[in-house]
């Protein structure tokens, strides 16, 4: 079990550091519990200082909580269908509030997360439950629109004495022999990152019987990993490979870092051959990122990072002394969106190719006709249903959504057709089974049965007088028999 999980604080008081912010958060919680709705909290600060832990500790004071983090797909539709519905619906436990946690909102990027920040802003306006948003970079443009809608709390790094105190307690609990100087140095090198300090301590404790100062001095730290700007600046301004590699240890999506570097190359480099060589390395980095995505082998990231970092850095003949303002991606963002459009086109063509048994090029040539056909709501639904189009694929051919009434109508028709097809198939099976039954032989009637029937018919033809005559004879015979019996008795 990881020590970060084992020693994770369970309450707000157990969270180390940021005492002033904790007091404000407790007041925020108390107001919600008293029935006074508050603006969402936006916790901003470096990784590893306990923002998520703090939010989860707060969650224990509410009836339930829902969390959406960086590992989840966070597109506009996903956020609205999960957090959006929960933000306005009642808790499972009655009238109590439920806490909604959105982690790493500044990390929402790429095709899968497009529209996510806008969806969060819409949810905040309608939310009836407390919300906590978490971000790493206070200056990220992605959260600029969210700052005005939230109460922003800037979380500070945990002080090294506080980290050292916790490491000592863990050493006692786990029975680890550690030199106090080693723990003090580890706390200092963690640069305020409590999680990093605990993970490093556990890794070293598993390798050494006694933790010494020399063990700590040999480890690398994560200093200067605060912003993406530092990493991009190092790539463009430095020619020292070690410095560049260390500077690129940023808590950001590496493809985004690559786009930042690519955007700012012509702002820093002035020679054509330098710019050409730098972009060749960017192309190679992008190639390895693509291989990593397609193969799901993320070991390719190392090669991609080397090309976009050391490769671009080495492309210049000398360092430039001028000041260069690092800007966020614009051209490469558009290129990325175009790449997304190409991927969408290829997905659609692949589905058409499989269903219609045509080539990709023929499928793509049909797109203009599909745009015309998709103007009809019912036809758009039928084509989408047949080809298995998803929502973003439908949007390729029409900007408007298919009306809900049309969808419900077409789904009912489809369900009715399925029932009819099932009944027809069932009838075919029944007819097939009946056809396998062998023909039955005719059963001949017994002669005795015919005779009995004739006798019955003769009886039916007898007249009433004949029946009366027979009954009269029976009456006359009975007394005679009785007299005979009496004579014989007297003779005896």
From Swiss-Prot:
Question: What Gene3D superfamilies does the annotation carry?
Answer: 1.10.8.60, P-loop containing nucleotide triphosphate hydrolases
A Pfam family per the record = AAA
Binding annotation for ATP: 45-52
Which superkingdom heads the taxonomic lineage of this protein's source?
Answer: Archaea
GO BP terms: DNA replication
**Segment Disordered: which positions?**
429-450, 462-492
Q: Bias regions of kind Basic and acidic residues — which residues?
A: 470-479
Query: What Gene Ontology molecular function terms does this protein carry?
Result: ATP binding; ATP hydrolysis activity; DNA clamp loader activity
> What SMART domains does the annotation carry?
AAA
InterPro entries in the cross-refs: AAA+_ATPase, ATPase_AAA_core, P-loop_NTPase, Rep_factor-C_lsu, RFC_lid
Keywords carried by this UniProt record? ATP-binding, DNA replication, Nucleotide-binding
Summarize the subunit comment.
Heteromultimer composed of small subunits (RfcS) and large subunits (RfcL).
Family from the record: Belongs to the activator 1 small subunits family. RfcL subfamily.
Role this protein plays = Part of the RFC clamp loader complex which loads the PCNA sliding clamp onto DNA.
- The name this protein carries in UniProt is Replication factor C large subunit
Query: Which species does this protein come from?
Result: Methanobrevibacter smithii (strain ATCC 35061 / DSM 861 / OCM 144 / PS)
